[in-house]
Amino acid sequence: MSTAAPFEPSRSDRRAVWLLVGLSLVFAIVPDNFSLGTVGIDANHTIMQGSGLRQIQYGSLFLWAAFLAWRHLSVTLSTLRAANPFLLLVVAYCLMTALWSPYPDITIKRSIIMIGLVLIGVAVAPPVGAPRQFLRAVMISYTAIMVVSFFVALLAPSVGVDTQLGNAWRGITWQKNMLGSISGFAAMLWLREFLIRPRKSVAAALLFSLFMLVMAKSATAILVTGLGTGVYLLTRHRLMGGRHAGVMVLLSALLGCLYALLFFYVAAGRMPNVSDVVGPVTALFNKSSDLTGRGIIWDLVEVAIDQHRVWGIGYSAFWVGEGGPAQYIANRIGWMPGHAHNGFLDILVDMGEVGMGLFLACLVWHAGSLMRLFRIDREDAAMHLGICVTILISNFSESQILRDTSFQNIMFIYSSLAISGRLVQARRARLS
């Protein structure tokens, strides 16, 4: 039996966690060039290509995280050893693709950002951060952005309202879908707070989040928020007894998917494609099955995937703007997208089947870690699961996962490492 004293973080450590999580998300969501009037294509390219200010912002956070990790080196190493190994392999493979990337400088820069985000995630994971501090930091950060966006939309509609998209609100974010997405995550997190502590102020924050979600007029955000919230509500209470209940639910869901796949194959004589999967759902929102014209982009991206099927073209080396590998897409559709509008296609074009295999293994490991967390803190595990489902589903129409400073990618990395930290804490508690 261990007699080592439990780790006790200082007040400054906890403040550092709030700031590292909050600022890294704010920097990802709020434009870095202060040109809030920019919409559409130009904004997308600023997001994807980065800027000197963005490098200073995240470089400062990475140095701060490195200092925090060094201060608590033994805790950092314990969390790192318990981390999802396939997440670390994905990041390592991102860097490795610089060997054949047509733009190795871009690949290396973006890979360094991924490494830095992992460093922040390790530095702020429990026990340095409180068990639920990461999710509360996300909630407060998104709420602050929504409050500022609310006043900007009312007082400066030329900046905060997108007149080209039905007067949808975008506030101080890049575009309406981003405001809708963070409003959805905030609504989920405030709902959890209300279920734990049903107070009027919490209810008001929840209603405000839902109001901002509606005003953003993002059907995708509304859909995935509803699905993620449903997963959270269904799993936060034990539906069946036994220590293997979570595994049984997971296997039952997998079996249901396999039966649905078999039924479709027997009925249609082929495997389902993206349109078959998303069509019935998007029809509820009067959207086409290719999610408003994204289908032509997907078809064109698949041409590049076929050319670099195994290893990929190189991490973040495809969507590099005019004259890059994606130029043929711009020539066909008349404008240059910033991404494929499908995160999974972007993984394939950047990192090939090897990278996709590592990412799928990362998800399987993440699911296993969640099952273990359910035995320790069911409430927290249910929310992490709901967030994961929301991120994965939304990436069928937006490219966020594994896209360096995309805020959903940041959330996924931090969530994975926060879970690892919780599991390390639980193991130490059993041994003490």
Enumerate the language-model features and the residues they cover:
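Transmembrane signal-anchor hairpin modules in multi-pass inner-membrane enzymes, especially those
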Residues: 1-95, 126-140, 193-200, 243-247, ...
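Membrane-embedded alpha-helical segments of multi-pass membrane proteins
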Residues: 48-68, 108-120, 178-187, 223-230, ...
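Hydrophobic transmembrane alpha-helices and their immediate junctions
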Residues: 126, 200-201, 253, 350-392, ...
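Alpha-helical transmembrane segments of multi-pass inner-membrane proteins
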Residues: 61-65, 91-96, 133-164, 173-238, ...
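Membrane-interface helix caps and helix-loop-helix hairpins in membrane proteins
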Residues: 99-108, 214-215, 397-403
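Long extracytoplasmic/lumenal interhelical loops at the membrane interface
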Residues: 282-299, 303-307, 311-351
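A membrane-periplasm/extracellular boundary helix in multi-pass inner-membrane enzymes
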Residues: 151-156, 233-285, 302-307, 315
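Transmembrane alpha-helices of multi-pass inner-membrane enzymes
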Residues: 381-432
